[in-house]
């Protein structure tokens, strides 16, 4: 377990420091005294529902994760599967969420699952999440006429990657190109296994299932903003809330910053101001949203990582 901790310690701590800096920046932009005043008027009746919605997102994402494992003929023990998936949430503050490849390492330790297969699952999770967020954001774009350039580009890039993964010819051409050089042959062999696994995950039925799950799960996060604004005494439409969280998440993902930190918060804040909220309420809503949809998941993930350590590495302990 020390090997895992050492590998991901720096990016995790880096993400944590950036996160704290972003919180300070949002408080300053929103006027600290004004934000505190808005928080003082928070209707606590909404809090349990807000805190429940983000974990519901994780439940749906776990369903997709388990579905992909089944398609890949990987069958971890149910309890360990839950802990391994949960552990990945602790790494959402690493750049581009690449820390979620931790799940691949843990599956390797648990059932000796090939990294080429499990990494394709993590990639498929991210791509289908991206498609789901783009669909949700598109609904808002149709209603508000905002983000017309970003979304077609997002669909285009994601679609191109999925189409590329349907064909092994480019990868086999690469294999012939590198010849008998040992290192590069290993790399191309990995890519061919990765592509073969990914192709199973992107059949039309699998793609539709994963995207529908993604739309549902990210819709819950949109409801967080809707309820947070309500709790602060403001008004925003549910469609507007879904647009804010999905569009800001896309921008955060495209930034490749840890957890989209800074970009996601700035986008949420700007879009809430654009939707007509006051500066203080927009800042307070941004903080509640990011705590519920990001940092709560990180805390849950750290608990999962601790429990995985106890289960997988009893001998080391």
Language model regions located:
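Predominantly cytoplasmic-facing regulatory/coupling regions of multi-pass membrane proteins
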Residues: 1-86, 143-253, 286, 291-317
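Membrane-interface alpha-helices at helix entry/exit sites of multi-pass transporters
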Residues: 78-81, 101, 113-124, 278-288
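Extended non-transmembrane interhelical loops and adjacent amphipathic helices
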Residues: 82-112
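Transmembrane alpha-helix interface/packing and boundary motifs in multi-pass membrane proteins
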Residues: 87-96, 245-265
